[in-house]
Amino acid sequence: MVRYSAAPALETKCAKARGAYLRTHFKNSREVAFTINGMNLKKAFIFLDNVKEHKQAVPFRRFNGGVGRTAQGKEFGVTQARWPVKSVNFFYDLLKNAEANAEAKGLDMDKLIIKHVQVNAAPKQRRRTYRAHGRVTAYLSSPSHIEIIVAEEEEAVPKANDTVSRVSLKQGAKARNLAARKAITSA
């Protein structure tokens, strides 16, 4: 059994999926994960499809040095955004896996929400490129470990109608004085 970094509240109401040593950039994957976390599963699939078609962009909030600006970032309140298609494809496949796991458990597909997404940096893979004057430079890739937990949305418990009115000390004293006066005048 593989260990996940987060434990769901109800194991029977959630489904999990994970990928290890995925050949996609860690920084791009982190930004995609941050964007889809908390989304409804169907909405996440639509968003990822739109990113593939360049209809929506993934906002880059943390790893945004040198990232160009686009108007598609405005919907998330940022100016810097990109379309990391390779990372999006990996997330799409992992979400499909989580969806299949949820269906196997008999969960309601319309109520599934992405509760937990985590991206960790995997060990760098080393290659080399040859430079002028006989030098060699490292040519590293930054793969990722990704884990996803989807869960059914909990039903909201209706709030009780009983509202206790809070009174300050001054208001309480006034009420007691008024009650005492009424008792004196009525007697």
UniProtKB/Swiss-Prot annotation:
<dbReference type="InterPro" id="IPR001063">
    <property type="entry name" value="Ribosomal_uL22"/>
</dbReference>
<dbReference type="GO" id="GO:0002181">
    <property type="term" value="P:cytoplasmic translation"/>
</dbReference>
<dbReference type="GO" id="GO:0005829">
    <property type="term" value="C:cytosol"/>
</dbReference>
<dbReference type="GO" id="GO:0030684">
    <property type="term" value="C:preribosome"/>
</dbReference>
<comment type="function">
    <text>Component of the ribosome, a large ribonucleoprotein complex responsible for the synthesis of proteins in the cell. The small ribosomal subunit (SSU) binds messenger RNAs (mRNAs) and translates the encoded message by selecting cognate aminoacyl-transfer RNA (tRNA) molecules. The large subunit (LSU) contains the ribosomal catalytic site termed the peptidyl transferase center (PTC), which catalyzes the formation of peptide bonds, thereby polymerizing the amino acids delivered by tRNAs into a polypeptide chain.</text>
</comment>
<protein>
    <recommendedName>
        <fullName>Large ribosomal subunit protein uL22B</fullName>
    </recommendedName>
</protein>
<dbReference type="InterPro" id="IPR005721">
    <property type="entry name" value="Ribosomal_uL22_euk/arc"/>
</dbReference>
<dbReference type="Pfam" id="PF00237">
    <property type="entry name" value="Ribosomal_L22"/>
</dbReference>
<keyword id="KW-0687">Ribonucleoprotein</keyword>
<dbReference type="GO" id="GO:0003735">
    <property type="term" value="F:structural constituent of ribosome"/>
</dbReference>
<dbReference type="GO" id="GO:0022625">
    <property type="term" value="C:cytosolic large ribosomal subunit"/>
</dbReference>
<comment type="subunit">
    <text>Component of the large ribosomal subunit (LSU). Mature yeast ribosomes consist of a small (40S) and a large (60S) subunit. The 40S small subunit contains 1 molecule of ribosomal RNA (18S rRNA) and at least 33 different proteins. The large 60S subunit contains 3 rRNA molecules (25S, 5.8S and 5S rRNA) and at least 46 different proteins. uL22 is associated with the polypeptide exit tunnel.</text>
</comment>
<comment type="similarity">
    <text>Belongs to the universal ribosomal protein uL22 family.</text>
</comment>
<keyword id="KW-0963">Cytoplasm</keyword>
<dbReference type="InterPro" id="IPR036394">
    <property type="entry name" value="Ribosomal_uL22_sf"/>
</dbReference>
<keyword id="KW-0689">Ribosomal protein</keyword>
<dbReference type="InterPro" id="IPR018260">
    <property type="entry name" value="Ribosomal_uL22_CS"/>
</dbReference>
